[in-house]
A protein has these predicted regions:
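Canonical Rossmann dinucleotide-binding motif of NAD(H)/NADP(H)-dependent dehydrogenases/reductases
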Residues: 2-29
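Conserved glycine-rich Rossmann-like NAD(P)H-binding loop of the short-chain dehydrogenase/reductase
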Residues: 24-40
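The beta1-alpha1 cofactor-binding region of Rossmann-like NAD(H)/NADP(H)-dependent oxidoreductases
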Residues: 50-62, 91
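Hydrophobic positions on the long internal alpha-helix
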Residues: 74, 108-112, 116, 162-163
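Conserved NAD(P)H cofactor-binding loop of Rossmann-fold oxidoreductase domains
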Residues: 77-83
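Catalytic loop of short-chain dehydrogenase/reductase
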Residues: 89-98, 117, 121-168
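C-terminal helical subdomain
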Residues: 157-160, 168, 172-173, 177-180, ...
Length: 227
């Protein structure tokens, strides 16, 4: 049985990913900062729960000790951050987004790496966005080209590059990054055109690749996403 941990998974895309992975018979840890909400949702779904705040080193280390064994890590936790106009955006606004969306990936990956390297087929799936794609944000035909969100977009671009660097440095693991697509979640006021089920297709597929599977790729449910 594959043991999978999904960060930030007490709602939205993370919750749906947990639900679908459980449906396919996997052993899934629902990880969330909010212990009360996380434990409640985990019980509803039939998942195991671990409290994990991706911005807190001690919380991450404690989660590793609780989990003990892991095959697949899905770095899903993320925030939209401030909606301030660009001229009013502060360094603190950007730092808050980077701390969760980028440094959170680094903290969690570093802490769980020994478990993943000890697995028969260790996998990491990082959740980015088309808003982190140079190609998508410069293509007038795509919705991403009409979004101005410097902190969020730059954070997701960083996640894409982090993924390719991890993939190069850790060839024993399969490490990929996915774009959920424009999905209806609270991050966009539920304005997205995809369902959360559609938004979890790519991460579900990449979570279950074997040793002969791809690594260092950027995909969505339709295929390759432009860098």
């Amino acid at each position: 049985m594959t043991t999978i941990l999904v960060t930030g998974s007490n709602k939205g895309l993370g919750r749906e990913a947990v639900r679908r992975l459980l449906e396919h018979g996997h052993d899934v840890w629902l990880a969330a900062r909010d212990a009360e909400a996380g434990a409640r949702i985990a019980a509803e779904l039939g998942a195991r729960f671990v409290q994990l705040d991706v911005t807190d080193d001690a919380s991450v280390v404690a989660a590793v000790a609780t989990v003990g064994r892991l095959d697949v890590l899905i770095n899903n936790a993320g925030i939209a951050g401030s909606h301030a106009e660009v001229a009013d955006l502060t360094a603190a606004d950007v730092q808050a987004v980077l701390d969760t969306n980028v440094l959170g990936v680094v903290r969690v990956t570093r802490a769980f790496l020994p478990l993943l390297l000890g697995a028969e087929s260790g996998v990491i799936v990082n959740v980015a966005s088309g808003l982190g794609s140079q190609g998508a944000t410069h293509d007038p035909s795509r919705v991403e080209s009409h979004v101005v969100a410097p902190a969020y977009c730059s954070s997701k671009s960083a996640v894409v590059m982090l993924t390719t660097q991890y993939a190069q440095a850790l060839p024993a693991l399969r490490i990929n990054v996915v774009d959920p697509g424009y999905t209806a979640t609270d991050l966009n006021g539920n304005q997205g055109t995809q369902t959360v089920t559609e938004g979890t297709d790519a991460r579900g597929a990449m979570a279950l690749v074997g040793l002969d599977g791809p690594t260092g790729t950027f995909t969505d449910r339709s295929g390759t996403v432009p860098w």
